[in-house]
């Protein structure tokens, strides 16, 4: 499948071929959902904490005598039913960590990329060099305006291009990531995905490992003549 190749001014300069493994990959919505839930859960710090009756300051003295007052007996002012008392079954520090194996992560990422291709919302950008790169936020804003991507977009750049990544940090409705850090959650949350040629090459070779796979050649079957010769 071919997608349009865009230069840094927003003009179409050619086509870019996308691997058939990405185009023909089935879209597994359940796996994508599981990947997003795992990603969001791993972002949680889990540092929430409330104090129980044994941790609240004070309450060491018995507030009033056991008998003779007509009130319900009480041994401390830090009981959960008292104002300023401890919290019962409140949140405690915990880990929300979830795990996905490499095969599931790769499958979720392939599903989101295949969906973006089917919706024609994946744009391949010409590689940056010393003469055409995002040296200022203005340059990045002009490119996005020329592409007419008003909604939330994901810009994937080569990991070594730190200057271009910094130039897009102050633009609304755009998330910039290195091709080494791309994940299914970021792709699924974005309306458009813009990626450079180096970025998509790095993604295919290092993350998806599509071009490194070698076909296993089957051994030729022995014929009757070969069998007789071996005997």
Features from the language model and the residues they span:
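Extended polybasic, low-complexity segments that bind anionic RNA or targeting/receptor surfaces
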Residues: 1-41, 45, 90-231
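Short coil/turn segments at secondary-structure boundaries
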Residues: 47-53
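Glycine/serine-rich anion-binding loops at beta->alpha junctions
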Residues: 53-89
